[in-house]
């Protein structure tokens, strides 16, 4: 029985071992703007802390966790590999979410492309309705999390969703995310999350969102 269990564990970790055999370190991406460029919507101080401290921590933790996972898998320690999954999801999700978030923002974000605007009108009635619905569900997130506009490739429609903590968006291609962890706004907006969420639309990078939409439809 023990030998059978060991063989099963070995088979389970072998595919992961192959993936981890060639690996590289994750790095903190540069911002596509200066820290002060999004003022007055988001202050220089918030942007610098958010990027250099919070996102950097997710990246550093992710690299450390992947090293531990590699070690566990190489030793055939399935129990340890499984135990690392929550931390991998949290820090990996934090890195993924923030890497999208930075590109979603711009001082002069323009307007949605014609194709995206037509789809917004089809699926939500109007851009105003989309903004209101996404804002409402994002403001209502309990604790920390994200609000997302995504594209469902299966149904070929735009959808909105929320994710707790740093869980990455699943079942859709992420187009635009709103970070409602307090570190994203508290120094400036205090506990008035609605003001922050409503204001962030002023710096939505519609060029980036439209490009993501076009790529998702391919």
From Swiss-Prot:
Q: Does the keyword Transit peptide apply?
A: yes
Which reactions appear under catalytic activity for this entry? 2 superoxide + 2 H(+) = H2O2 + O2
Native organism taxonomy: Eukaryota, Metazoa, Ecdysozoa, Nematoda, Chromadorea
Q: Which organism is it from?
A: Caenorhabditis elegans
Q: What induces it?
A: By heat.
- Enzyme class, UniProt record, top EC level: oxidoreductase
Its GO biological process annotations read:
removal of superoxide radicals
Protein name stated in the entry = Superoxide dismutase [Mn] 2, mitochondrial
Q: What is its EC number?
A: 1.15.1.1
